[in-house]
UniProtKB/Swiss-Prot annotation:
ATP binds at residues 602-609. The lineage of its organism: Bacteria, Bacillati, Bacillota, Bacilli, Bacillales. GO terms for molecular function: ATP binding; ATP-dependent DNA damage sensor activity; damaged DNA binding; mismatched DNA binding. It comes from Staphylococcus haemolyticus (strain JCSC1435). InterPro entries: DNA_mismatch_repair_MutS (IPR005748), DNA_mismatch_repair_MutS-lik_N (IPR007695), DNA_mismatch_repair_MutS/MSH (IPR017261), DNA_mismatch_repair_MutS_C (IPR000432), DNA_mismatch_repair_MutS_clamp (IPR007861), DNA_mismatch_repair_MutS_core (IPR007696), DNA_mismatch_repair_MutS_N (IPR016151), DNA_mismatch_repair_MutS_sf (IPR036187). This is DNA mismatch repair protein MutS. Gene3D superfamilies: 1.10.1420.10, DNA repair protein MutS, domain I (3.40.1170.10), MutS, connector domain (3.30.420.110), P-loop containing nucleotide triphosphate hydrolases (3.40.50.300). GO terms for cellular component: cytosol.
């Protein structure tokens, strides 16, 4: 574009360096966008798209936003996945001849937001990088708003994906094109993936990372952060290394299925474990709580250390209540310190910092009065009295937001500033006296002396008072004409204006310099402030644990050395909270080395899934160091939790419900150990009945013979309930239900033994399906059950249990041939049954329903809860009635 103006040439040159960003190009009081940037921004921001050089042959698309309100527009663009490069004027246009120098001072990306309004205060804003070296991965991530920086090494892709999901970054930086399947998995977390082809000469050092892979991953991350932010980030902490195996492992599906931090239906915090447990009082505590939920501990000593502090707060109710009041006055120290270091802190932020650190002595004194494990654990709390005094002496209590307009500092903080302010004040007093004098001299009572930034000070007279008024007679010089007034200046006013404005300008300039000096002084406290923030966040989490334990009647869990899981009257903490507490039915669970598999049967909607979830959630809460919703809890320490709950296609990867089910089952069967917990909810329902039944049985046998992981397995395949005869480690339990006058009543109580009825039609009635459908289903079911009974008399059960001598690996060709012959015989019988069933069902459908008193009695029998003796007695009674 040879005919473009010098300004547009400057724009195009800068834009060529930031092609993946929307360029905010500063022109006066606006940030302007051009070409495709303007089209995109106008659409997303819903602002007017105009044209530059509209009368020329090829006008340039253009839009803009005011610079003073740009943050809200930038926030909207970032939330829509864009990056924004901010290009500022580096010179004062009024004092520059020719083209004003411009350059990009910062690139805002989803992972580098620093503005308070652009972030959820209760969520970290992570940016993450990883590299692949041979078959291993190294990963590093940070939150530049808080200074947190961590790195780890990972052995395989599955663990990498799990770790990325746990961290939940808003942006990912990689050094090469990544595998398409891996990219799809990453898109579960974030769509902002940046590829960096090379690392620039670093102006920083990655300290204390001896592992070369982690060093390179962290260097890649920091190179990108410094490249986009273009400033000192001294608040970034020294990189902390960790190992994923130091925490309980849960993959994306487990966290989703258990609804730990996000609900499945609403995609929100409400209705999750995080929602239940969050009684924190500070943003730092809320963020720490989410981290603890995502990473339960596996170190028994650390778990019990947290539990002992929670117990201390439980025993000191009054002190805990007082502590909550103190914490409520603490602002987000982590992010306040981050803004100090970053350079975008304002005076109101520093007042918040002052109030926050003023509470530390109160908190420390309170903990010391408890004189127990809590006071010892948090003894490193530091009052920071010297910093508090500096803030107390310097800033006024309610300063303006802008740091460039003055009015920030207390009188007495700076002698020079006081002199400027006094000169300005005296000048304003003089102006008030001049206004009174001019009113007297001219006889115009409404005359006033005013000021604006364009014209300075002036005398204003309304048009109604101008009739017969001669300005020259009073030494007035016309300055501006308005529709309803005239504005004048006098030589005396002009002379005083220079003095007043000179003092004001000097005062404003000096206040800005003083504020920058104060900010730099506070930066020297960065490390100490970050340490206090970390302590307060952990303290806040632990008092929150005590608060919910007291409020909802939780107990302190104990950890067994013999790997026993024993829960008495356990409850699902979230379901219990949304229900009336007295309506929730608690249940027991007992798994140990000998009986480590529960096979759970019962009707739909009876509470099987809730029961399994509550066992998993109680285990997570316990390993976080929290009390749990039970009367008594003895638990092992689980290394991993695997879940297969619910039916949902994976639309991202294009996988069916059944494929997702099998993939989740594969992970559990492959990676589970004796120290793992497996939750399988109705495995096999995504395929044909016989395939599903066979797979479900094979999985149960595999767990029983290999990993010995503690397993809760719910099913509607009632044929599986005979497995307890061959697998000593398996125990049948069921969730009880009752029938009363043809209506199904859920008891929600888990009892020993199996049931052979899923009450599907009764559940359908509860869902208000049409009566015609319900009646038709009952007829078909009766016919099918009659045919099935005939079949059962002709052949044995299809359930075949592998003996210990015939392990999964030892399944022979002869076994396969026998199974094939059995399948053929079963298929012949099955075809005959289906023909008989089909004929019977249509005959029954056309007949009228006959009812009688005896039929009603039979219909209302709860066979599942009757003993054999009770059944025989009832049968005899009915037989007598028929005679």
């Amino acid at each position: 574009m040879s005919n473009t103006t010098p300004m547009m040439q400057q724009y195009l040159k800068i834009k060529s360096q930031y092609q993946d960003c929307l360029l905010f190009f500063r022109l006066g009081d606006f940030y302007e966008m051009f070409f495709e940037d303007a089209k995109e921004a106008s659409r997303v921001l819903e602002i007017t798209l105009t044209k530059r050089d509209a009368k020329k042959e090829n006008p340039i698309p253009m839009c803009g936003v005011p610079y003073h309100s740009a943050n809200s527009y930038i926030e909207t663009l970032i939330n829509n996945g864009y990056k924004v490069a901010i290009c500022e004027q580096m010179e004062d246009p009024k004092q520059t001849k020719g083209m004003v120098k411009r350059e990009v001072v910062r690139v805002v990306t989803p992972g580098t937001v620093m503005e308070q309004g652009g972030m959820d205060e209760n969520q970290n804003n992570y940016i993450l990088s990883f590299i692949k070296q041979d078959s291993n991965y190294a990963l590093s991530y940070c939150d530049i708003s808080t200074g947190e920086l961590k790195a780890t090494q990972i052995e395989d892709e599955d663990t990498l994906i799990n770790e990325i999901v746990t961290i939940n970054p808003n942006e990912i930086v990689v050094n090469q094109e990544i595998d398409e399947n891996l990219k799809k998995q990453i898109y579960l977390t974030t769509e902002t993936i940046t590829i960096r082809e090379s690392i620039s000469d670093a102006s920083y050092e990655v300290n204390q990372l001896t592992n070369n892979h982690m060093y390179l991953a962290t260097q890649l991350l920091l190179d990108y952060v410094y490249h986009t932010q273009k400033r000192d980030l001294s608040h970034l902490e020294t990189a902390i290394t960790y190992a994923a195996v130091d925490f309980m492992k849960m993959d994306y599906y487990a966290k989703r299925n258990l609804e730990l931090t996000e609900s499945i239906r609403l995609k929100s915090k409400k209705g999750t474990l995080l929602w239940l447990m969050d009684e924190t009082k500070t943003p730092m505590g809320a963020r720490r709580l989410k981290q603890w939920i995502d990473r339960p501990l596996i170190n028994k000593e650390r778990i019990e250390e947290r539990l002992s502090i929670v117990e201390s707060f439980m025993n000191h109710f009054i002190e805990r209540d007082t502590l909550r009041g103190y914490l409520n006055q603490v602002y987000d120290i982590e992010r306040l310190v981050g803004r100090v270091s970053y350079g975008n802190v304002n005076a109101r932020d520093l007042i918040q910092l002052k109030h926050s650190i003023s509470e530390i002595p109160n908190i420390k004194s309170l903990l010391e009065s408890m004189n127990d494990v809590a006071s010892n654990q948090f003894s490193s709390l530091e009052p920071l009295e010297d910093l508090l005094q500096v803030l107390e002496d310097s800033l006024i209590e309610e300063p303006p937001i802008s740091i460039k307009d003055g009015g920030l500092f207390k009188q007495g903080f700076s002698k020079q500033l006081d002199e400027y302010l006094e000169a300005s004040k005296n000048g304003k007093d003089w102006l008030a006296q001049l206004q009174a004098k001019e009113r007297e001299r001219t006889g115009i009572k409404s005359l006033k002396i005013s000021f604006n930034k364009v014209f300075g000070y002036f005398i204003e007279i309304t048009r109604a008072n101008l009739q017969g008024f001669e300005p020259s007679k009073f030494g007035y010089h016309r300055k501006q004409t308005l529709s309803n007034a005239e504005r004048f200046i006098t030589d005396e006013l002009k002379e005083k204006e220079d003095i007043i404005l000179g003092a004001e300008d000097k005062a404003v300039d000096l206040e800005y310099q003083l504020f920058v000096r104060l900010r730099e002084h506070i930066k020297t406290y960065t490390e100490r402030l970050q340490k206090q923030a970390k302590i307060i966040s952990e303290l806040d989490c632990l008092q929150s644990f005590a608060e919910i334990a007291q409020k909802y009647n939780y107990v302190k869990p104990e950890f067994s050395d013999n790997k026993t899981l024993s829960l008495e009257n356990s409850r699902h903490p979230v379901v219990e909270r949304v229900m009336d507490y007295n309506d929730y039915v608690p249940n027991d669970c007992k798994l140990d080395k000998d009986n480590f598999i529960y096979l759970i049967t019962g009707p739909n909607m009876s509470g099987k899934s809730t029961y399994m979830r509550q066992v998993a959630i109680i285990s997570i809460m316990a390993q976080m160091g929290a009390y749990v919703p039970c009367n008594k809890a003895e638990l092992p320490i689980f290394d991993q939790i695997f879940t297969r709950i619910g039916a949902a296609d994976d639309l991202v990867s294009g996988k069916s419900t059944f494929m997702v089910e099998m993939l989740e089952a594969q992970k559990a069967l492959t990676y589970a150990t004796e120290d793992s917990l497996i939750i399988f909810d109705e495995i096999g329902r995504g395929t044909s009945t016989y395939d599903g039944l066979a797979l479900a049985q094979a999985m149960i046998e595999y767990v029983a013979q290999t990993s010995h992981a503690k397993t809760l397995f719910s099913t509607h395949y009632h044929e599986l309930t005979t497995l307890d005869q061959e697998l000593p480690s398996l125990k049948n339990v069921h969730v009880a239900a009752d029938e009363y006058q043809g209506e199904l009543i859920f008891l929600h109580k888990v009892k020993d033994g199996a049931v052979d009825d899923s009450y599907g039609i009764q559940v359908a009635k509860l869902a208000n399906l049409p009566d015609e459908v319900i009646n038709r289903a009952q007829v078909i079911l009766d016919a099918f059950e009659q045919s099935q009974n005939t079949s059962d008399n002709e052949e044995h059960s299809n359930i075949t249990v592998l003996k210990d001598s015939a392990s999964v690996e030892g399944f022979t060709d002869d076994d396969a041939q026998n199974a094939n012959n059995s399948d053929k015989k079963s298929q012949t019988t099955k075809n005959a049954i289906e023909n008989e069933f089909e004929q019977a069902s249509f005959n029954l459908f056309d007949s009228e329903a006959m009812t009688s008193e005896i039929e009603e009695q039979i219909k209302n029998l709860n066979i599942s809860n009757m003993t054999p003796i009770e059944a025989l007695l009832k049968l005899s009674e009915l037989q007598n009635q028929l005679r």
